[in-house]
């Protein structure tokens, strides 16, 4: 065979691989999207019901407790939803190392769960709303424990995303059905958290048993657990700090003002975060492949980064514009009478969608796969602190709009900072291109 024939053969093989790879990526993203939409739409059907049954004050109390629970989830996950996925994506062909990672991550998560117990006790002592409504705190903690121990990272790292995604969606469906059956009056709000905690517990128990059926079972170890916590600490700082301007906004707002204001802001934020979460399946489909390619094929990883910007960035701009224009209709349908003041809050928060879309591309799909956790985490810590400071300055005067302004400022700081970091590392924004000499930075 001549050299030109060899070149043509190699080119044909590369094209064939590229088509198969893109087909698999598209298939994973599509399946994840279906599962995610199922898991999102069904509980989202409960929002109009809960907003009306619980009224703004009761709905605000529920969102306050959910917000605290979701922040506890970040503590228990300790960044392993990203660092664990990244590690598994790189060693998935090595059964021995895979078993060691599973053993280490599970040990670390159990330790992190134990750390949340004093945090929860402190919240009960220090927060009047929790002292007056202990059932909300208890079930919020139990939900966090179940969700935080999820072994999704193991399956996602091997690009086996579909079954776990549908299992979680199924748990949400069951919880949503329970809401319609068991939540009838404003005092029943805690039952929403209880149903979510029980549904998630069943799903996570099944997935954990599935994971351990594929790897050797090893008893959790304090020493190994602390070692894994140390290895994932930089991503945990990023995750925990980002929670201060993502998951914990309703909780922060509830510390400053009354539950009714939390209900107005939280209702608008729930709508906009629901839209933003539709970007998650795409990000989950790209992340393990980009992490794998960043080590083995940087050229392919660069192409994937551009592809993720087109899809994630493009969709986020469309969704942001749509949510701004449709805000009055969305509030009327999803929240109902008594929530009219949430319309301008929702319109302001619609700016978050494209900001977070761009930030996701340069943060999750570039900074983490290439090992830039430290500068990324630094930006997120700064944004989390800024969000808290602005919240305490703006909320007493502007209420929910003050909280919205605080969140937007924090998210914009992260997105702009990541773009600057990308340029400083030799990247190009147009056309999007990573530095040709860029290497992986391990921490």
Segments the model singles out, each with a brief description of its role:
Residues 3, 23-81, 176, 233-260, ...:
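Signature of the first transmembrane helix
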Residues 27-44, 164, 170-175, 192-207, ...:
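Transmembrane helical elements of multi-pass membrane transporters/channels
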Residues 23, 27-43, 65, 69, ...:
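Membrane-water interface segments that mark the loop-to-transmembrane alpha-helix transition
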Residues 124-140, 325-355:
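Interfacial segments at transmembrane-helix termini and the short loops linking adjacent helices
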Residues 134, 144-167, 353-380:
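Membrane-interface junctions at transmembrane-helix termini in multi-pass inner-membrane proteins
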Residues 2-25, 189-190, 205-246, 285, ...:
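Interhelical loop/hinge segments that connect adjacent transmembrane helices in multipass membrane
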Residues 134-144, 165-213, 382-386, 400-424:
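Hydrophobic alpha-helical transmembrane segments
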Residues 77-93, 106, 268, 272-296, ...:
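Helix-loop junctions and terminal segments of transmembrane helices
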């Amino acid at each position: 065979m001549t050299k030109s024939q060899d070149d043509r053969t190699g080119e044909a093989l590369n094209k064939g691989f590229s088509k198969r790879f893109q087909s698999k990526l598209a298939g994973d993203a599509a399946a994840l999207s279906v599962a995610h939409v199922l898991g999102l739409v069904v509980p989202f059907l409960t929002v109009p019901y809960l907003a009306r049954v619980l009224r703004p004050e009761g709905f605000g109390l529920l969102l306050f407790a959910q917000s605290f629970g979701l922040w506890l989830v970040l503590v228990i996950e300790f960044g392993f939803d990203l660092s664990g996925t990244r590690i598994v994506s790189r060693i998935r062909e090595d059964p021995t190392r895979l078993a060691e990672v599973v053993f280490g991550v599970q040990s670390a998560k159990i330790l992190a769960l134990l750390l949340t117990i004093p945090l929860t006790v402190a919240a009960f002592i220090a927060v009047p709303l929790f002292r007056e409504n202990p059932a909300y705190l208890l079930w919020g903690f139990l939900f966090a424990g179940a969700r935080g121990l999820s072994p999704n990272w193991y399956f996602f790292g091997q690009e086996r995303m579909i079954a776990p995604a549908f299992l979680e969606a199924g748990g949400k469906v069951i919880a949503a059905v329970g809401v319609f059956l068991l939540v009838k009056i404003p005092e029943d709000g805690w039952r929403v958290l209880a149903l979510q905690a029980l549904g998630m517990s069943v799903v996570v128990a099944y997935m954990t048993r599935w994971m351990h059926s594929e790897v050797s079972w090893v008893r959790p170890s304090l020493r190994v657990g602390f070692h894994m916590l140390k290895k994932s600490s930089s991503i945990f700082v990023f995750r925990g700090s980002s929670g201060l301007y993502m998951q914990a906004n309703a909780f922060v707002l509830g510390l400053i003002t009354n539950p009714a204001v939390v209900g107005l802001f939280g209702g608008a934020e729930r709508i906009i975060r629901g839209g933003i979460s539709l970007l998650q399946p795409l990000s989950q489909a790209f992340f393990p492949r980009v992490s794998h390619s960043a080590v083995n094929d940087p050229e392919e990883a660069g192409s994937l980064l551009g592809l993720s910007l087109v899809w994630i960035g493009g969709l986020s701009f469309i969704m942001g514009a749509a949510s701004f224009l449709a805000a009055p209709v969305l509030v009327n349908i999803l929240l109902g009478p008594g929530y009219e003041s949430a319309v301008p809050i929702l319109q302001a928060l619609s700016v978050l969608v494209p900001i977070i879309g761009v930030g996701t591309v340069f943060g999750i799909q570039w900074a983490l796969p290439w090992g830039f956790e430290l500068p990324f985490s630094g930006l997120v810590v700064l944004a989390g602190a800024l969000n808290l400071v602005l919240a305490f300055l703006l909320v007493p005067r502007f209420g929910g709009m003050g909280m919205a302004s605080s969140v937007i400022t924090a998210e914009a700081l992260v997105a702009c900072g990541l773009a600057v970091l990308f340029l400083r590392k030799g990247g190009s924004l147009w056309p999007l291109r990573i530095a040709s000499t860029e290497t992986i930075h391990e921490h």
